Amino acid sequence: MKKIYRLLYSNKFVAMVMLLMQIITFVAMYIWISDYSKVLFGLSTVLSAVLIIFEINRTEESTFKMTWITLIAIIPIFGALFYLFTRAQGVSMNIGDDYKNIQEANKKYLVQDEDVMKNIYQTDKNQDGFARYLSKYGGSPAYTNTGVQYYSIGERMFEDMKKELLKAEKFIFLEFFIINHTSRMWNEILEILKKKVKQGVEVRVMYDGMGCIATLPRKYNEYLERQGIKCRIFSPIVPLLSTHQNNRDHRKIMVIDGATAFCGGINISDEYINEKMRFGHWKDTGFMLRGEAVAGFTAMFLEMWNVNDEHIENCGEYIQASKKYSVSTDGFVIPFGDTPLDEVYVGKRAYINNLNNASEYTYIMTPYLVIDDEMYECMKYAAQRGVDVKIIMPHIPDKKYAFYLARTYYKELLKAGIEIYEYTPGFVHAKMSISDGKKAIVGTVNHDYRSLYLHYECAAYMLNVPAVMDIERDFKDTLELSQKITLEDVKHFNIFTKILGHIIRLVAPLL
């Protein structure tokens, strides 16, 4: 009875009921309009034609265009109305304006050191331009004097997260897509946060409204506030049909005193540390920064924190705190964020840069593989140039529809000379790319439309840091545990899942 009561009063149940009622209403209106008269149907045909012409002439990735055109053409009235509904709303302008304003205010604390750029040029001339691109559009300069600790599994990262939290003296910032209040992982972190609040440490926690809809009870932010922890929910779920709720905060950031920062694929729930088995062994990755580059993640957190605030917070004290934690080490680190607020797809460009500038290899680990034409062509071109391109995917998926969709790309990628492997012990949730033993990207960005176009994401680009070799070693170790997929294997995939995957692919950019 208690379980039923909790379900009926949960965020997820209320939101689903309200959304279902709205969907039923829209479907009923659609049926009524479709049968009402030939005049209305004629008008809808004209509207569909106008919208198709409009979409063809938009500056947009071609796969998005084809999806919309197909939807409008096949289902004229519903497709046209859905298109207008989606395009009219776009990304929330309030969030966009707030984010850009705080980002502009923080620029004076994130000035690029030109000596660093000169050193990058001397180290690798091909990466100088890309480093400047990331510095301009990714929201953070390139840094030296930063130590990088790579984690090949969530359990090890969690242990170091706790150790660093216990060292906190001034502030702790947490920003996660998912926090599960019943998990051992969160409860151990929460106990440390409560302890630190009593010691006078400023603690801020931010989580995504959609990501936590089933893992946190209603008004959990108020509970945390009562513990002395400042808390905000990014884009709380409102039971109204709106495309604004499509843009989620998918970032995973932990910053302690400006001295250390953690990032990667790991959320705060027990499956990420293999305390709870859901899809076999959970393979995830992440990293800890210690030193000057931590400032980039501090700034990213504060930019999201200050969205919807009436007054822009002065973030200088927090961002500049990293200067005194400088670590003498080799290489360069560029923290970067990506948002749906512009048409600059930083995460996508970072992955493409690794492919286009590779001379020996590019290795990719991703839980989802839903790529557009440009990404496919870059992978194909790299393989045609003789670059060894390998992709590790899950063998046990968390979302079957996404897995069936990903497998529709296998045949064309294999024919292009790209090697695909599936991690047989379980689920790969790692998001990373490594190239030539020099360049690596680790963070929250999946190889799918949601991450590359729709979500708020973050990662770090690493050039010639010692940890890059750890990343390469981990990839090769994971490869040993993975099954190589061949064209013969693809032929024997279940026919029904293949058909379903290709049907889903028609609307992949909208998922």
What annotation goes with each model-predicted range?
Residues 1-349, 353, 357, 381, ...:
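N-terminal localization/anchoring segments of enzymes in phospholipid and broader phosphate metabolism
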Residues 358, 368-389, 394, 399:
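Helical hairpin unit composed of two closely spaced alpha helices linked by a short loop
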Residues 431:
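Catalytic-core elements of nucleic-acid end-processing and repair enzymes
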Residues 419:
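Surface segments flanking catalytic/ligand-binding clefts of nucleic-acid enzymes
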